[in-house]
UniProtKB/Swiss-Prot annotation:
Gene3D superfamilies, alphabetized: Ribosomal protein L6, alpha-beta domain (3.90.930.12)
Domain of life according to the entry: Bacteria
UniProt keyword list: Ribonucleoprotein, Ribosomal protein, RNA-binding, rRNA-binding
Function: This protein binds to the 23S rRNA, and is important in its secondary structure. It is located near the subunit interface in the base of the L7/L12 stalk, and near the tRNA binding site of the peptidyltransferase center.
Species of the source: Acidobacterium capsulatum (strain ATCC 51196 / DSM 11244 / BCRC 80197 / JCM 7670 / NBRC 15755 / NCIMB 13165 / 161)
The keyword ATP-binding appears for this protein: no
CC terms in the record's Gene Ontology section: cytosolic large ribosomal subunit
GO annotation, biological process: cytoplasmic translation
Known partners and oligomeric status: Part of the 50S ribosomal subunit.
Protein name as it appears in the record: Large ribosomal subunit protein uL6
Record family assignment: Belongs to the universal ribosomal protein uL6 family.
Length: 179
C-alpha cells in the first residue's frame, strides 16, 4: 500500500496540466516540464487536486513514484528547486564565467570549468565560497549539484572540499604518532 501515492497533489492557480499518452506536461509561471509516467497509473483532476490512481495491485510499486514525479513537476514550475553547496578550504573558490559556466579553483594545478546544462542557473555569493544551483527540474538540479560536489569531495581528515549546506561530515583521526 502506497501512502505517498494516495496523497492528492494541489494544483495552484496559474498552473496548466495536461496528460496524454504516458506523458504529463506541467506549465507554470517558471516554465514547462514534460514528465514520462509509468504504465498502469491514471491521473485524475478533481476540485483543484490531481489524484494518482493505480489500475491493478501490480502497479503498487510505481504508484508513489508517479505521484512524486508529478508533485515535483508542479512544485518546480511554481516555486522552483535549489541546492546549496559550500566550498571549504584555503584558496578554494568558484566564479561565474558568462551565464553558463562555473570555474572552480579547488587546489588542483588547473582551474576546473563546469558547464551548466540548459534550464539550470548558478548563483555564487560575493565570498565565492557558496554556490546555489537552481532550476525547475528537481532531478537535474540534484544531479548538477552532485556533479559539482564530486569535483572535490570532502576530505575525511581535514573536511576540505565541496559539500552540501548542512551536510554532516565525520572527521577521522590522523595516525597516532609514536611516543
Amino acid at each position: 500500500m502506497s501512502r505517498i501515492g494516495n496523497k492528492p497533489i494541489p494544483l495552484p492557480a496559474g498552473v496548466k496540466y495536461t496528460h496524454a499518452g504516458g506523458k504529463v506536461v506541467v506549465e507554470g509561471p517558471k516554465g514547462k516540464i514534460e514528465q514520462v509516467i509509468p504504465e498502469g497509473i491514471k491521473l485524475e483532476t478533481k476540485d483543484g487536486h490531481i489524484h494518482a490512481i493505480r489500475e491493478t495491485e501490480k502497479h503498487a510499486a510505481v504508484h508513489g513514484l508517479t505521484r512524486a514525479l508529478v508533485f515535483n513537476a508542479v512544485e518546480g514550475v511554481t516555486k522552483g528547486w535549489s541546492k546549496d553547496l559550500d566550498i571549504v578550504g584555503i584558496g578554494y573558490r568558484a566564479e561565474l564565467k558568462g551565464k553558463d559556466m562555473v570555474v572552480f579553483t579547488l587546489g588542483y594545478s588547473h582551474p576546473i570549468e563546469f558547464p551548466l546544462p540548459t534550464g539550470i542557473t548558478a548563483v555564487i555569493d560575493p565570498k565565492q565560497t557558496r554556490v546555489t544551483v537552481s532550476g525547475i527540474d528537481r532531478q537535474k538540479v540534484g544531479q548538477v549539484a552532485a556533479d559539482m560536489r564530486s569535483l572535490r569531495k570532502p576530505d575525511p581528515y581535514k573536511n576540505k572540499g565541496v559539500r552540501y549546506v548542512g551536510e554532516k561530515l565525520k572527521k577521522k583521526a590522523g595516525k597516532a604518532g609514536s611516543k
